[in-house]
Each structure stands twice: as C-alpha cells, then as structure tokens.
Regions:
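Generic signal for short, ordered secondary-structure residues
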Residues: 4, 67-68, 90, 162, ...
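Short, cysteine/histidine-rich loop/knuckle motifs that typically chelate Zn2+
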Residues: 17
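A generic fold-level signal
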Residues: 2, 39, 106, 188-189
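C-terminal cap of thioredoxin/glutaredoxin-like
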Residues: 7-10, 14, 22-34, 113-226
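Extreme N-terminal starter segment of soluble prokaryotic enzymes
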Residues: 2-8, 42
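Structural alpha/beta surface segment adjacent to cysteine/selenocysteine redox centers
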Residues: 23-135
Length: 226
C-alpha cells in the first residue's frame, strides 16, 4: 500500500536560499521517483513566509537593500555574497542576478495559495518556479501584476480567471495572513523550513541543504513507511 507523504515547504519568493533549496529538493525527488516501486508518494505543499513584511508594494532597489540590511553597507561583503550565490546557483542551474526591486510578497503568496488549493501541486509548483525565475534571474518585480500573470500563464491557468483573481487584491488575503501567523506560531523564524511527513515520524530540514541530504531524508521516510 502506498503511503502519501506531504512535504510542507515554507518559503518566501524573494529568498534566494529557498530557491536553492527547492531546486535541490526537486533533484532529490526526481532521484527517488526513478524507482517506480517506491512505496511512498511525495507531494509538496507550499507555505508562506515573509522575509520583509514591512516592504511596500512599490518596493526599493534590491542591491541597495541587501547591502544595507544584510551587509552593513559594505560593498566588499556584498561582492562576496554575490560571488557565493552565483557559485551555488550555477551548480543548480540558476543564473542569479542582483538588480531589480525588493517588495512586499503578499500578492505572490496569495497567488500560490489560491491556485494550490484550486489546481493542486503541479499548478502551484509551476507558479513558484516562474516567480523564482522572474525575480532572481530576470530581475522582475516579485509581485507586480505582470509578474503574477506571467506565472499564472506558465502554470496553464486561464488568462481571464488569473487576471480576475490577481486584480481582486482582497480575495484570499486574510487566509494568507493567517497562514503566515500560523507559521510564526509554529516557531518558524527563517526559511527555507521543510517538514517531510512520515508514517512514524516527521523529518524537519532547515536551510538549503545539499541534494544528498534531501535524498537521505526521503529515503528515511520510505524505509520507515515500508
């Protein structure tokens, strides 16, 4: 009998470490799924988190914000960060860029959560992949209407339906805010934060671990579910 394991992946669409973690988890899942006899069906469910909840919708310069808020206005430290992230990104097929705008991500989370509930894991996965790529590799605004509609289109969502949802800024907003509060209540104060549901126990992974560590965790869930 196949055991259904939900992987709760808490993220913010402006967090580069969650982008790396998702790529690595995707690779690990692909390895595990190569064995068609695996007695566990893994499904990823995304949960919202905000790195910068006080950000405006208009946003501010991404490079300047990182340099000031994370690296003490040091160009040297910022250069080291960009080199490190570029190196990590290249390994996972991500072409990190550091320009663009950092802004409030509530509209992006609203899109993810609404269509995750309505369209399922494949749809939400496509939305998240698009939002990450647009923000980190194409320097797009993280929650502009154009960005959200592009993500919806790439996920196969009807254009009229997507536009209607995106433009109704209140639909699903309180639900997303409640989910964010729930995550805080669960003690989550950094992302990525990943919980792999198991038959005997859950496995929690914090941070952007390597592919091998994700594989090891998934294999443990499989072993304990057999």
């Amino acid at each position: 009998m196949v055991y259904d394991s939900e992987i709760q992946f808490t993220l913010d669409t402006i967090c580069p470490w969650t982008y790396l973690a998702k790529r690595r988890l995707d690779k690990a899942l692909a390895q595990i799924r190569e064995d068609s006899s695996t007695p566990v069906n893994f499904t990823v469910k995304f949960k919202p988190y905000q790195l910068y909840p006080g950000a405006s919708q208009e946003g501010e310069d991404k490079y300047a914000w990182y340099r000031k808020s994370r690296y003490g206005d040091s160009d040297e430290k910022m250069a080291k960060y960009m080199h490190l992230m570029s190196m990590y990104g290249n390994k996972e097929g991500i072409d990190f860029k550091f320009g663009g705008t950092v802004a409030n991500t509530l509209p992006a989370h609203r899109l993810i959560q609404h269509f995750q509930e309505k369209g399922g894991p494949e749809m939400s996965n496509a939305i998240v992949n698009s939002l990450y790529r647009q923000y980190f590799e194409e320097e797009k605004h993280p929650s502009a209407t154009e960005t959200l509609l592009t993500a919806a289109n790439e996920a196969g969502i009807d254009e009229t339906e997507a536009k209607q949802f995106v433009e109704d800024e209140n639909e699903g907003l309180q639900d997303v805010k409640m989910l964010i509060r729930e995550q805080a209540g669960n003690g989550i104060d950094a992302v990525p934060y990943i919980v792999i549901e198991g038959k005997r126990r859950d496995i929690t992974i914090e941070g952007a671990k390597e592919v091998e560590e994700f594989v090891k965790a998934l294999e443990s869930i499989i072993k304990e579910s057999s």
